[in-house]
Structure formats: structure tokens, C-alpha cells
Amino acid sequence: MGRLILEHTLQGHKGRIWGVAWHPKGNVFASCGEDKAIRVWSLSGNTWSTKTILSDGHKRTIREIRWSPCGQYLASASFDATTAIWSKSSGEFECNATLEGHENEVKSVSWSRSGGLLATCSRDKSVWIWEVAGDDEFECAAVLNAHTQDVKRVVWHPTKDILASASYDNTIKMFAESQLDSDWDCTATLSSHTSTVWSIDFDAEGDRLVSCSDDKTLKIWRAYHPGNDAGIATPDKQSVWKCVCTLSGQHSRAIYDVSWCKLTGLIATGCGDDGIRIFKETSDSKRDEPTFEQLTAEETAHEQDVNAVEWNPAVAGQLISCSDDGTIKIWKVDD
């Protein structure tokens, strides 16, 4: 049985911490929160410390931050309805671009695998796709109004230019660029949750997605592509996503975040009951009927809601979390 071992507890932000994001190299991370500031932390020896505080980019709470795949840029999504792009090209972090267009709070931001596209989503129910048009130039490529409520999260597929979004309307939607006319279309709607879908994450290959919800469940979805050997029909030659597993009974409140480790296959959740839980696919799991077990849980990981969890992309088994309690914690799963 694996255990979750606490390695570091870090403080610095004032108020609740909404987001944490590992740098692709895994030796730096960024955090953001209610204090309108971004902190960039780095590891020196065995000590994590704040190297930079970026406090002049936003007028309201910063909800989420994400590093570009190349690690040169940091995007921040804020309740002030803007997304800021930061880079260190001059040696110090500077805000190089501010993306405007959403009518309300921006809830999430995500870079495509190539770094050539950026997605944002908002309480205004829309998902925007931006093209990186050159140095610090971003052009709106699409405004997608497929959701009927607040959109909570956007995440790009790990190998293709497919975007997934999760919403207060209880659904997840998939978007892809049409091969006919370069318009972005909604290619799938994933319906099974009975309340807000707070977060989503793809597995390493991108053929499966995990979602977490206000309904206290985790769901695993699988893509069935045209010509699949399971005999699943694919109308219009579009991939069909089916819910193949539901995990319930482990969480006592809303699950706010989920992270699927690309290195180990473990799934971590951050919950409104202050806990962090780790799930592992069982050895006898079937492709079309997968089974997962709870590997370990830290029921009181934080003193208040756990807002975000993310596996380190470079260090297997290392997890970061942040909370309304104003702390960031770094954990290690001991197998």
C-alpha cells in the first residue's frame, strides 16, 4: 500500500491559494491566489523558496496559471476578465501581453502541446482559442459558445490539437479544428455527471480522460475512434467518448481538482473535504471496463478546501497541492 508523505509546507501568499503549476522541468513551480500575485518558486538544495513575485498583472484574484511547454512563458487567468502572458526573455519576468475579450472572470488557461495555441474559459460561458502569432502576439482564432453555463476548466490533449472543457452545466465538451474550413467545432459532449464538472485531465496517451465533479464522483472516459474494434458507432467519423468507470464513495464533498500522472498512471484528487486521495488502476483492469482502487488518502491534507493538485511532470510520484488555508504542500507517493 502506498503512502503519501509530506515533504514541504510552503507559505507566502495572503489568503486562499487557487492554483499551482509545475514548470516542465519539474524544478520550478508557480502559484497564484486571492492576493492577485503570482509567486515563482525554485528548489535550491532541499529548500523551496520564492524567487519572483509578480503582482502588477491583475486587478483581481488570479484563478489559474500554466507554463508553456517550452517553459519560457507563463499564462495567468484572472477574475479581472483578462489573461496575462509573462516571459523572462529580458532576464526578469515581465507581462508581455494581456488577452482581453471575456466578459467575466477567466477561470482557466491551457497551452497546446506545441505551444502554438492557448485556450481560456470564463464565467461568461465561452471558451476562447488564441493563436500565438509571433513574439508576444496573440490572435483570437475562435470563440466557442457550446456550454450553457460557467466554464470551469480547459485542458489540451497531450498529442493532438483537441481541447476539452468542463462546465457548471454538468458536461465536458471536446473541440477540434474542422478539416474543411479551419473553424473550431464541438466534436463531442460527455454527459454523465449530475452536477458541476470542476476539473478534467487526460492520461499520457490522450485516449482516456478523468473528470471530477460537485457530485463527489470521479469518472473515467475512453475515446472510441472510427473503425474501433469494440464495435462502438462513430457518427460523422468523429471519435466518441464513453464513460467506462465511475468512482464514488471515497469523497464526502465536491472534488475540485484531478491530475492524471503521465509518468506513473496514478490519479490524484483535491477535495472540498480537505483531503487528497490517490487512485491506481488495478492489475486486472479491462480496456473497456477499467477498474481503479484507492491507493492511499490523506484525509486532512489541508485545513480547508484543496483547490488544486498537480503531479510533477519530471519527478515520478511527486505531487503539489494548494488550499484555501493559504499553504502549498509538496508530497511524495511512497510505493
Curated annotation (Swiss-Prot):
Keywords: Repeat, WD repeat. WD repeats lie at residues 12-51, 57-96, 101-140, 146-185, 192-231, 250-289, 301-335. This is Probable cytosolic iron-sulfur protein assembly protein Ciao1. The keyword Membrane does not apply. Coiled coil: none annotated. The keyword Electron transport does not apply. It comes from the Eukaryota. One of its GO terms (cellular component) is cytosolic [4Fe-4S] assembly targeting complex. The gene is Ciao1.
